[in-house]
Amino acid sequence: MKGLFVDTAGWLACADIADPAHVKAAAARDTWLQEGGLLVTTDYVADETLTLLRVRLGLATAEEWWQLVDSSPRLRWEYVSLARSDKARAFFFRYRDKEFSFTDCTSFVIMRELKLQEVLTTDHHFTQAGFLTLPK
């Protein structure tokens, strides 16, 4: 099954109807799922997403999002282990000319490990790291 990584910016764009990328992001996610694909995300991305949803859209929206993703059979959870964290830290400090967040670096490590090329996000850092972003 083909996997699409979902970054915090992708989750936010899908959840927030006021987000400029909402329509395209939700359509890209829905098309991916309709074509039999699997969504992939991490515990670090979920941490960021829950926090930002609560701040921007309220606790009820954050809770609704959590219930939706937590029960989804089409979502694969990946966790940032100590080994993955060590690799992410090395990546974080290697690219001094980029403003990658540490969470982004953990995502890059996991995406490379799982051989995922596509990511649902509006964050340009994924393009800088060599991944293909959706929506286009």
Residue spans of the language-model regions?
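Short secondary-structure boundary segments
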Residues: 43-44, 104, 123-124
